[in-house]
Amino acid sequence: MWNLNDSPDHHEESDSRGNPVGHVSNGMSQSATWLPFVLPVTRNFFPAQSMEPGVRWSGFNSVGKSDPSGSGRPEEPEISPPIKKSRRGPRSRSSQYRGVTFYRRTGRWESHIWDCGKQVYLGGFDTAHAAARAYDRAAIKFRGVDADINFDIEDYLDDLKQMGNLTKEEFMHVLRRQSTGFPRGSSKYRGVTLHKCGRWESRLGQFLNKKYVYLGLFDTEIEAARAYDKAAIKCNGKDAVTNFDPKVYEEEEDLSSETTRNGHNLGLSLGESSSEEFRLKSDIASIRSRIRDEERLLGSDLSLAMMTTTVRSEKQQSDGGGNRVVGMAASSGFSPQPSPYRIPRTFHFSRP
């Protein structure tokens, strides 16, 4: 033990067991002799820092699989083929078809499709099958023939021709018109609506900065649709969207052009004859004007003669010797003066 006041003792002190300090007991010696055999075992679990990191895990590769060769190089991971992302979306919970959902409030099967991050309404239908076909048509129009659809692409070969002439918006309107949820009073044909009077109204929308152009009322729905088609062709030409095949109107236009050409030729021939008639009429008019002038002159002469005879008769009645006086006045060259108290009567003869 150490003496804090004095210098430490130089004699050897013994521990509680009687062994001197600094002496190693048998237990420690045994552990010391066993320690060299334990170190190699601990080095396997905790390798020294001098070892390379690749050597530590020589028996394992990067994916956790053992390397049978023991070369220490990790095996290349297997590259799985890329999964094709489906653009058709998940199946509907209420229908077996894609893009079809049943709505209890309306009692109809409604069809929707996603385009550019927005859900587009395609219409409401009475059956899920009709709604699924509407979805397929829209998917083919928006995404091409490789789109995921409910039925075979062969069922829509006839629709592909119509899709090429329509834009997305126009094709959506076509699908909505074919649906059951389209408003009442409307027609399945483009540009045709049922008027209040019971006839079908045809009008062309958004033309020349106008909301619509009124085309008229028709007795049948087809006549109104044909009127719309003709107006659309005149405004937009070959790019016009029509209800029926534009070739039908081309044939009608050819027939109308031939009729117009024939009518023009007939008008020319009639024009020649009409010019001759005009000459005759002008000649007759000139002759009649001459006759009127002659009759006017003749009538003035006759009226003057009648007036003269009337004055003479009145003079004879007023004067007893009126004949002798009138005769003398006439022989002398002076015309008889009418009586100031009597107004002479004038006679006008009408033209025969």
Swiss-Prot record:
Region (Disordered): 1-27, 57-96, 312-352
DNA-binding span(s): 96-152, 188-245
Induction (record text): Repressed by miR172a-2/EAT.
GO cellular component, one term: nucleus
Keywords associated with the record: Activator, DNA-binding, Ethylene signaling pathway, Nucleus, Repeat, Transcription, Transcription regulation
UniProt feature, compositional bias: Basic and acidic residues: 7-16
Compartments in which it is found: Nucleus
BP GO annotations: ethylene-activated signaling pathway
Main location: nucleus
SMART domains xrefs: AP2
Family annotation (Pfam families): AP2
Sample GO molecular function, one term: DNA binding
PANTHER family, per the entry: AP2-LIKE ETHYLENE-RESPONSIVE TRANSCRIPTION FACTOR, AP2-LIKE ETHYLENE-RESPONSIVE TRANSCRIPTION FACTOR TOE3
Sequence similarity: Belongs to the AP2/ERF transcription factor family. AP2 subfamily.
Protein's name in the database: AP2-like ethylene-responsive transcription factor TOE3
Provenance organism: Arabidopsis thaliana
Organism phylogeny: Eukaryota, Viridiplantae, Streptophyta, Embryophyta, Tracheophyta
